[in-house]
Amino acid sequence: SSAASDVYKRQVVINDNNPAFNDADFTTISFESYGELDELGRCTTAFANIGKDIMPTEKRGAIGEVKPTGWQTAKYDSVDGKYLYNRCHLIGYQLTGENANEKNLITGPRYMNVDGMLPFENMVADYIKETDNHVMYRVTPVFEGENLVASGVLMEAESVEDHGEGVKFNVYVYNCLLYTSDAADDTPC
């Protein structure tokens, strides 16, 4: 569909869109797991099997008290939402209800959060709401050297009950600061 192809314009598909889950990972029991922060205080992998039973039923609370590595406040009138940087949930709030969990928040520009990650999160949430099935979901921030801000995130998902027929992706979403919203090609950012 054109909506699905629009999602991929600023991302790179990894391994022909096949996630790297092990067969043993698949279950119909919902869970969520957040890796320990590394020695520099950076997030590591967030992993979940998302079902309706762990999706939130209330609006997200404040997350301003969490200062992920590399955090800075930068406000510009020309940026949609005014703030250049967002606290980006590795696993979006709408999926597991994790709010101000420092193991689930990284610094990223609004573009990566809203245009990069959110369409994939919405795809998963919509599928679960429509089918009541589960989706294996893993997001891994990728840091270069000792950088405190991730260069991007690896997002993997696969629907469980229908073996990936409903949702299946493995994409790297760039942490982009500068971009042109009218780019006609598939050049990242």
Predicted regions and their residues:
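Short, small-residue-biased leader/transition segments that mark boundaries at the very start
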Residues: 3-8, 182-186
